[in-house]
Amino acid sequence: MRSDTITQGLERTPHRALLKGTGLPQSEMGKPFIGIATSFTDLIPGHVGMRDLERFIEKGVHTGGGYSFFFGIPGVCDGISMGHKGMHYSLPTRELIADMVESVAEAHRLDGLVLLTNCDKITPGMLMAAARLDIPCIVVTAGPMMSGRGDAGRKYSFVTDTFEAMARYKAGVIDDAELARCEENACPGMGSCQGLFTANTMAILTETLGMSLPRCGTALAVSALKRRIAFASGERIVDLVRQNITPRSILTREAFENAIRVDLALGGSSNTVLHLLAIAHEAGVELPLETFDILAKETPQLASMNPAGEHFMEDLDVAGGVAGVLKQLGDKIHDCPTLMGLSTKEIAASLKGVDEEVIHPLSNPVKKEGGIAVLFGNICPKGAVVKQSGVSDKMMKFTGTARCFDSEDKAMAAMMGGVVKGGDVVVIRYEGPKGGPGMREMLAPTAALMGLGLGDSVALITDGRFSGGTRGPCIGHIAPEAAAGGPIGLIEDGDTIELDIPARSLKVMVSDEVLAERRARWVAPEPKIKKGWLARYAKVVTSAHTGAITTAE
């Protein structure tokens, strides 16, 4: 075992002494050493329940014949960090998390890892570490929050109800009392935000990839089932160490295609494009951005999930969860191994039935195409991403007038000040991985558009990204980004922009000659942040179309 490096032989006397200083008995010295990477924090509702799950994982490890050690991993809440300087840090923490897990596991020669995670960037960061290390690992996602409850049976969703409520209040649609009800009821307790936002989408994709146990992706944070899954994951990691089953044997090209199809079928968060590309890179799997669009054209959307639809995670779990989606997709799914031991199709076949009001059959899809589309054009020669499941039929094709802003903050001020009107295309740039830096989420602007009643008359394009809670005609991940000299930085107020999602096209209607003249005048702006982690990040991060990964090149 890897841990023999620190437990066996005369030369390791000092190492054993230090381990015994933690309370480790001599009798446990030869057992598999299992690291429990926990992202517990009481700053985030998605992570406040992890102390309980830690105990169940620990019990499982010891029942399985291993010896466990806890180590801490940071977590950032995208909701709390939204709309201010904090959002610059969200995506970069994904890289920090992967590096921290790698560092602790390698420094202490751990034999296997249980990765306890939940919210947006923590789960992909953990998966990136697992793929990079390629030692036995299993993921436990802490589970979704229950929907909020209001008067007359109303259900509240944190993302759609609170962020859009601000704009509705500003527009006079709701009063002080209703705004207060939203705030009080939107988050009833522990768990990740209730709809198919980034955290829950990534939990579902983790299960689909085979890196967590069945139902882990949808079992509610408050459920006893989640605790049993945590215990079983602790037991299972010891078996994985003994059998030397490692992540790269699970994270194959076919497994990634399964994850993309499930993502498309559910209408999941567009952030998953960034994360799956990054995880695939760590796993040594070639996964071009175009793969998402190729699969979208042949994978219908089978569920109508909040934020764009009516169903919450609690509904999806009861309807059949990930296994239910796999079952409905049928032959579109590859039969891949999972950490549980059963194959993907064996897990799907074990499900007795599916609630087809929630997870539709292929014969009766919600939409003919999957939830994510990849666009190209003279604004985005290396690609852009739109969550088409959240776009109304009216806005699938749209021509409008450019209104340009060089930051999210300036765009928000204009929207809330009534400057943006129907027929506009809001262009938010210099918010990409390098330019942001950190590729901030644009939930506040998109929620403002919906709340102000402009969702069917204004489009938004950006080299930043969007929250899983975003809905409406919002195109992100534009590559190359403005800070790298991308064409989005050459658009001027008054230009005509043509969006055609069915044709996968996004263009500014000016000639190549005009764009060349503008490029000759373009000057790269000064970095917004010149010291600290974000300054270093901006120098090494790649484009959105490659997953916004950091490289040594």
Curated annotation (Swiss-Prot):
* Free-text function comment from the UniProt entry: Functions in the biosynthesis of branched-chain amino acids. Catalyzes the dehydration of (2R,3R)-2,3-dihydroxy-3-methylpentanoate (2,3-dihydroxy-3-methylvalerate) into 2-oxo-3-methylpentanoate (2-oxo-3-methylvalerate) and of (2R)-2,3-dihydroxy-3-methylbutanoate (2,3-dihydroxyisovalerate) into 2-oxo-3-methylbutanoate (2-oxoisovalerate), the penultimate precursor to L-isoleucine and L-valine, respectively.
Q: How is the co-factor bound, per the entry?
A: Binds 1 [2Fe-2S] cluster per subunit. This cluster acts as a Lewis acid cofactor.
Q: Does the keyword field hold Iron-sulfur? A: yes
> Looking at the record's lineage, which domain of life comes first?
Bacteria
* Active site feature: 467 (proton acceptor)
Q: Please report the name of this protein according to its UniProt entry.
A: Dihydroxy-acid dehydratase
- Residues with the modification N6-carboxylysine, per the entry, are 121
**Which reaction(s) are listed as its catalytic activity?**
(2R)-2,3-dihydroxy-3-methylbutanoate = 3-methyl-2-oxobutanoate + H2O; (2R,3R)-2,3-dihydroxy-3-methylpentanoate = (S)-3-methyl-2-oxopentanoate + H2O
Q: How does it assemble?
A: Homodimer.
Q: Which GO terms describe its biological process?
A: isoleucine biosynthetic process; L-valine biosynthetic process
Gene3D superfamilies noted in UniProt: IlvD/EDD C-terminal domain-like
Enumerate the UniProt keywords alphabetically: 2Fe-2S, Amino-acid biosynthesis, Branched-chain amino acid biosynthesis, Iron, Iron-sulfur, Lyase, Magnesium, Metal-binding
For Mg(2+), which residues are the binding ones? Answer: 78, 120-121, 441
Pfam families, alphabetically? Answer: ILV_EDD_C, ILVD_EDD_N
**What GO CC terms are in its UniProt record?**
cytosol
Annotated GO MF terms = 2 iron, 2 sulfur cluster binding; dihydroxy-acid dehydratase activity; magnesium ion binding
In the Enzyme Commission scheme, what number(s) does this protein have?
4.2.1.9
Q: What's the source species for this entry?
A: Citrifermentans bemidjiense (strain ATCC BAA-1014 / DSM 16622 / JCM 12645 / Bem)
